[in-house]
Structures are given as C-alpha cells and as structure tokens.
Amino acid sequence: MSQKQKNTKLLVPIYLEALAVTKPMTASNSGRTWADLSPNFSSFRRRNVPKLGIQFAPVPFQKGATPPDMGVHLHWALPAELTHGVQHLGEAMQFPTVPNRWFVLRIPTDAPDDRARAKAWVLESDYLGRDGTNTFLTYDPKSETFSYLRLGKAFAYGDGPKENQNYLQQLTAIGLGNPLFAAFYPGCRNVFGFHDDLAGIDAGTFSYLVAGWYAQDEDDPLNPADKWQRLKELKSKWNVVDLADDEYPTETLCHGTVHSLQWARNT
C-alpha cells in the first residue's frame, strides 16, 4: 500500500467551553461560596503523616477558597479515546499519552477600539517547574523521596519557551492518578484550560480557537509501530470520514472553537 506524505494531519474536534467573569467575584457580592477542590500535597513535607488520598483532599466549601479571576476562562475536553485506560491481566492500568502542546487564539469579531486585538498563546501542558501552575508531585526512585513542582505553563506566541526546561515524561488524562484531573478546570489550568485576563479591554465580542498536538512524534497515537492496525481501530472509534484505505495521517491535531463571546467589564 502507498502512504500519504509525512505531516498529513487528522483533525479531531474537541468540545471547548468558556466562562466570562466580568467583575470581581467574592462570596459577599455573588452570594456564593467557592469550592477549591484541587489536591493539596503540602502534607508531604511533614513526617509521620499517612500518604493516603484523603490526606490530599481539600475541605469542600472551606472559607478562603479563591473564586475565578476576571477574564475569560477556557476549558476543553480531550477526545474520549484518550481518556480511557486499558488494563491487561497482571499489569497496572495504562492511559494513553495526550497532546502536550496547545495553541490558543483570541479573535476580536466586534470591538469598539484598537485595544481589543487578536492575541495568541502557547501552552506547554507537560512543563514542570517552580513557576508552573498546578501543584504536581514528583518521585525520585533513587532517593525514594517525593517532592512537588508545578505543572503547566503558558507564554505569548512568539516569545518561545526557555532552554533547558524540565518536562513530565508522560502526560495523561488522569495526571497523578486523579480520574477528574482533565475534567476539573481549577486543577488543570495551562494544561487543559487557559485564562485570558483581557487586560486593558473593557468591551468587545470575541471568538477563541484552541488547537492541540504532540510535541514528540512517538507519543502520537497515529505514529505506532503497527500503524495500519491502529488506523483501523481509530477509524472505527473516531468515525474518520473521507479517508481512503491507502491513506494514513501521521499526526493528530485536536481543535475546538467558541464563537461570539460577549465581554463587558464590570457588568
């Protein structure tokens, strides 16, 4: 069989949703109590504390939980095929690697002044560092010790990442083993979610485009050793249309959009 040339992409639609927070949200002005359900790994610094899941679960609706900041909050759902684990007899459950690079584009469709310009960002979802976003545990098998860094980082398109950065070896939908990791926006910001603060913009209508891919070719599900068998499986599960039997895309590109989101500060 002949194959398509390299870099042929399979476009995979994803569900993208947006929340516009137009004024500061507090318990006093909104009448709501905000729950912070993000895992808290600070107890790892204390000795003689059981390393159990309940130790890391926050107290629901505790006072002082931080409400979402002003701006537009984007959160996207991964393709279902990438959120299901597989467990073989006698082995641990394995989850597939998910896209670890995301491009976010803000597009003004109706803006009153020049400040509401298009802007783009790149997310390194697998970035690990002290200046990352979400608390994330790491384990050193040599010293048999745990420590925590922060996962996920965003930078303006064109700035580029810094050199010699540290990255997670494998990014999956469950993170450290939390089945709600990818589904819970406060715990996966700059991983599978993004906050646009719309600084300096008072009003306008905007659309957002999000696109995700794999930084390493070998992590892409379209680039396995038995690629033709894998394509057959994907065509049955992902409903690939208009693809001939002798065609084979070599890269996955996830994409989603939100159209005509209205923004008016302090309203």
Language-model-detected regions and their locations in the chain:
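Extracellular structured ligand-interaction cores
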Residues: 71, 99-101, 189-193, 205-207
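Short, compositionally biased serine/threonine- and acidic-rich segments at solvent-exposed termini, linkers
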Residues: 2-3, 13-15, 20-23, 36-38, ...
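Beta-strand-rich modules
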Residues: 100-104, 199-217
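Extracellular low-complexity, O-glycosylation-prone stalks/linkers
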Residues: 88-115
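Signal that preferentially marks extracellular ectodomain short beta-strand elements
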Residues: 155, 177-204
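Low-complexity, serine/threonine/proline-enriched polar segments
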Residues: 107-181, 266-267
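Beta-strand-dominated extracellular/periplasmic modules and repeats
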Residues: 81, 98, 161-169, 189, ...
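Pro/Thr/Ser/Gly-rich low-complexity, intrinsically disordered linker/stalk tracts
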Residues: 1-98, 219-267
